[in-house]
Amino acid sequence: MVGAGTETTSTTTEWAMALLLNHPEKPKKAQAEIDAAVGTSSLITPDDVPRLGYLQSIINETLRLYPAAPLLLPHQSSADCKVGGYDVPRGTILLVNAYAIHRDPAAWEDPAEFRPERFEDGKAEGRLLMPFGMGRRKCPGEALALRTVGLVLGALIQCFDWGRADGVEVDMAEGGGVTMARAVPLEAMCRPRAAMRHVLEEL
């Protein structure tokens, strides 16, 4: 479980950075939020993460577009039932395709577009997000994963200005596997923010 959590957390952080590099106005907005809520005299802490609404929206939108586990864990039907008009006998193994649900144009406006704002202020669209599953059988590590990604991504945004390594748009091709890694490694350029340099020098 620890290994699975580590891989999915790092994968989500990498996808988030790739998306932010292709949309440079988004990390600027997140930087402004962090500066206002946390300041520049200390690093972001785990207690800060839940208070940073736009950072949370970036993470949610990343998980919508690139869920670390695009197919949720298999479940078995405990009784005969109907799902979407289909007969499902008792004992059937069921998989939920979170990737397809998160990109369904019937459920999401402009589903292929990276738009963290869709999760702001409790908008209805946000209730359809399920990267960790739903109900009593959803991933028990959800809270830890969200807190960890928030802390890592928040610190990267707070402390550095980021740019694309070669100046061209980051390739968003998806790799294969159980977890949805990137097809090509992410390369980026970073520069310490002047406002955070004194904090970084003390680390």
Where are these regions (language model features)?
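Cytochrome P450 catalytic-core helices
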Residues: 8-26, 31-33, 142-159
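A structure-centric feature marking long, well-folded core domains of fungal metabolic enzymes
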Residues: 23-26, 69, 104, 135, ...
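Hydrophobic, well-ordered secondary-structure elements that form the walls
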Residues: 30, 62, 88-91, 114, ...
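Cytochrome P450 proximal C-terminal region
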Residues: 35-37, 41, 134-203
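Conserved cytochrome P450 K-helix E-x-x-R motif and the immediately C-terminal K′/meander segment
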Residues: 43-84, 105
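An acidic site on a long C-lobe helix of protein kinase domains
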Residues: 51-54, 128, 145
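Conserved cytochrome P450 K-helix/beta-meander segment immediately N-terminal to the heme-binding cysteine loop
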Residues: 66, 78-80, 96-123
